[in-house]
Design a protein with these regions (language model features):
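Positively charged n-region of N-terminal signal peptides that target proteins for export
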Residues: 1-7
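Bacterial N-terminal signal peptides
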Residues: 7-13
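Active-site-proximal alpha-helix that buttresses catalytic centers in soluble enzyme cores
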Residues: 18-113
Length: 113
């Protein structure tokens, strides 16, 4: 029974895998942008109230993302409203994803990664 289930899961995985061909078409969004369009990178995290954990995880990931996309405006948002509220009492302001998207739209960004 376990072998059959494992075989089925493997077949589904192979069938659904993205690859260059079939249903997947590689494209460079930034290369296809028209004059006047702007792109930004929005990193969304659950969040943490622990400063040391944030430095070792979220800030490290954000630094790698900034390095990978140096030409894009960088923003971050947290999904946990509890974390956002607790950080705000300590003077650390984080946006929700909706707030970040609305702010980017207000600033004229047309493409968000």
């Amino acid at each position: 029974m376990k072998t059959s289930l494992l075989s089925l899961l493997l077949a589904i995985f192979l069938f659904c895998s993205a690859h260059e061909g079939g249903n997947f078409v590689s494209s460079d969004m930034l290369a296809s942008m028209k004059p006047g369009e702007k792109a930004a990178l929005l990193m969304v995290h659950f969040g943490t109230t622990h400063d040391d954990t944030r430095t070792q995880t979220i800030d490290a990931i954000n630094a790698q993302a900034r390095k990978a996309f140096p030409d894009l405006e960088f923003r971050e948002a947290y999904t946990s409203r509890i974390i956002i509220r607790r950080l705000k009492t300590r003077g650390v302001v984080k946006n929700t994803p909706l707030d970040a998207l609305l702010q980017l739209r207000g600033e004229g960004y047309t493409h968000i990664i």
